[in-house]
């Protein structure tokens, strides 16, 4: 079997696992279920500097170079941050409320007519569906607020368009796949440069939030739950649950598990966008740095979030 077809089979398997787990999670919504509240001490305004240079890309460890310095958010964008953005963007007209959805303008992609390619013309596209029971945002009295307890959890149920619009608002952007992978793996310096996980060569239940990892949020049954606060796996003890400090070599947290992360690449001949990092609903093997998934840019899920680069 060629590497190309083996890679396709792995991607199909990952997609099927995500779909199956998503169906399992779609029980009766209990949006009022109490959520454990822990202070991780995360400074969600913090950025990590990543210098130009080489790193090992992919499962087959190909040396690749990025020719520019850049920065990425240390933590995933939170519900609290996204609510503040929506209030500003709604006031300035950057986004609009239409039939219980948040939409915004996108300039469109070049359409090349490839098989299965979907045309994305200039126009308004879905950012967030406000009536989804998995969403932890509320719109009351002309303002967005966060459902209590979810303020510092990663923003989820946001499409690629909605993630990109957040970054654009502040003159940032979504990271490319290569930028994301280097931030997760670290430099080509001979010190575990081929690590499969952001923190090293092995994974334990105390490293990240993934399927059956037994964190304090694992038993929550309401649809859309089971994310952990950003930066949760920082070496602290929460009740009886002791975490391992699991940042990447550049100091980024949640680069494996919790939620899949949108990346910014727009590839020719296809409309799909790519996600990295695995999530609370995937097995530990899908938290390896090189694992990719894809979805239409209008896709949203309780297991998908994002962070920005600049």
Where are these regions (language model features)?
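A short glycine-rich, aromatic-capped structural motif
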Residues: 41-124, 157-161, 257
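Bacterial signal peptide processing site
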Residues: 27-29
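C-terminal motif of bacterial Sec signal peptides marking the signal peptidase cleavage site
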Residues: 23-25
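Short, structured beta-strand segments at or near domain termini in extracellular proteins/domains
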Residues: 302-310
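Bacterial N-terminal signal peptides that target proteins for export
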Residues: 2-15
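Functional-site microenvironments in short loops/helix caps that host divalent-cation chemistry
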Residues: 56, 138-293, 300-302
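Core domains of carbohydrate- and sulfate-ester-processing enzymes
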Residues: 97-143, 206-216, 220
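Short, low-complexity, disordered segments immediately C-terminal to signal peptides
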Residues: 31-39
């Amino acid at each position: 079997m060629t590497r190309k077809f083996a890679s396709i089979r792995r991607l199909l398997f990952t997609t099927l696992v995500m779909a199956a787990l998503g169906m399992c999670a779609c029980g009766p919504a209990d949006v009022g279920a109490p959520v454990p509240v822990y202070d991780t001490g995360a400074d969600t305004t913090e950025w990590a500097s990543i210098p130009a240079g080489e790193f090992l890309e992919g499962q087959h460890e190909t040396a690749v170079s990025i020719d520019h310095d850049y920065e990425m958010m240390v933590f995933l964008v939170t519900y609290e941050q996204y609510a503040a953005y929506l209030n500003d963007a709604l006031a300035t007209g950057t986004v609009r409320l239409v039939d219980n959805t948040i939409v915004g303008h996108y300039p469109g992609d070049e359409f090349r007519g490839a098989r299965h390619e979907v045309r994305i013309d200039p126009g308004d596209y879905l950012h967030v569906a406000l009536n989804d029971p998995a969403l932890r945002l509320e719109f009351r009295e002309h303002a967005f607020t966060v459902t209590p307890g979810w303020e510092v959890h990663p923003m989820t149920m946001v499409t690629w368009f909605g993630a990109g619009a957040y970054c654009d608002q502040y003159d940032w952007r979504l990271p490319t796949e290569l930028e994301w992978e280097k931030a997760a793996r670290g430099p080509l310096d001979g010190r575990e440069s081929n690590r499969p996980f952001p923190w090293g060569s092995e994974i334990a239940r105390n490293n990240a939030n993934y399927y059956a990892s037994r964190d304090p949020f694992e038993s929550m049954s309401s649809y859309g739950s089971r994310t952990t606060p950003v930066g949760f796996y920082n070496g602290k003890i929460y009740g009886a649950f002791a975490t391992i400090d699991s940042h990447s070599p550049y100091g980024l947290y949640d680069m494996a598990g919790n939620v899949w992360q949108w990346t910014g690449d727009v590839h020719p001949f296809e409309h799909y966008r790519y996600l990295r990092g695995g999530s609370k609903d995937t097995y530990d093997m899908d938290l390896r740095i090189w694992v990719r998934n894809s979805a239409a840019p209008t896709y949203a899920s309780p297991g998908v979030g994002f962070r920005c680069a600049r």
